[in-house]
């Protein structure tokens, strides 16, 4: 049986991806989920239709916001863009896991509490994809290498598949936060994800936060779907 403390902790660790292309659809999901979800991801789909203003709206309502824009540009541009995000009181922000980009992001963050996350390898990619990009190593080795660089430059965490979470814990001495997308409930469709794990598996592997979109917003009852995922996460948090 899941305790209330485990459920509360699990709720804080669930990030619902607002993968929409207009604000009204995203706003409706937030209303439908109510107090059951406290953390949301705003990505590229909403960026050009008022994503930053919507992030302000969510924060004013007491929600935490993960701004998933995956910044990748010249260092000065990244630094200034990150500084602007910090002024919004964003909780998490992603940048590409390139050393110079991560350094610029850390500088732009300044003294704010915003957490900078380096993107390692997208969960929609597999060994064949990274081979096409010119890498001869395994996905796991590339993820670990980028995480080590993230740790060296002062980034707070990484975005990585739960499949690599255990190795990341081992190679970074538990000093990096791990945020894992590519999460699918048992038996759920993978869609465009190639490296996936269930909520239970991901939490047990060492992920700190889980990002789920379609399993919630495409469900017949999004609120019930979110609650079921939170229960599964809470079960994983309980000691054996």
Swiss-Prot record:
Gene3D superfamilies: Aldolase class I (3.20.20.70). Substrate binds at residues 19, 41, 68-77, 123, 184, 193, 213-214. One of its GO terms (cellular component) is cytosol. It is an enzyme of class 4 (lyase). Its EC number is 4.1.1.23. Catalyzes the decarboxylation of orotidine 5'-monophosphate (OMP) to uridine 5'-monophosphate (UMP). It comes from Nitrobacter winogradskyi (strain ATCC 25391 / DSM 10237 / CIP 104748 / NCIMB 11846 / Nb-255). This is Orotidine 5'-phosphate decarboxylase. Belongs to the OMP decarboxylase family. Type 1 subfamily.
């Amino acid at each position: 049986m899941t305790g209330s403390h485990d459920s509360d902790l699990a709720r804080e660790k669930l990030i619902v991806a607002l993968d929409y292309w207009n604000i009204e659809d995203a706003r409706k999901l937030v209303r439908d989920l109510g107090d059951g979800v406290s953390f949301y991801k705003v990505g590229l789909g909403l960026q050009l239709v008022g994503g930053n203003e919507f992030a302000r709206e969510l924060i004013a309502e007491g929600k935490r916001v993960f701004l998933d824009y995956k910044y990748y540009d010249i260092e000065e541009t990244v630094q200034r863009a990150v500084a602007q995000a910090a002024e919004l009181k964003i909780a998490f922000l992603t940048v590409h896991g390139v050393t110079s980009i991560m350094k610029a992001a850390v500088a732009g963050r300044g003294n704010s509490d915003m957490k900078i996350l380096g993107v390692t390898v997208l969960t929609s990619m597999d060994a064949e994809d990274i081979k096409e990009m010119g890498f001869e190593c395994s996905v796991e080795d590339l993820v670990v290498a980028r995480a080590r660089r993230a740790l060296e430059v002062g980034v707070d965490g990484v975005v990585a598949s739960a499949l690599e979470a255990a190795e990341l814990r081992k190679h970074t001495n538990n000093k990096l936060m791990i945020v894992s997308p590519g999460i699918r409930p048992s038996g759920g469709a993978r869609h465009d994800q190639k490296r996936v794990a269930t909520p239970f598996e991901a939490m047990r592997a060492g992920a700190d936060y889980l990002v789920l979109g379609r399993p919630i917003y495409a469900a017949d009852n999004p609120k019930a779907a979110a609650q079921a995922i939170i229960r599964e996460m809470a079960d994983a948090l309980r000691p054996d």
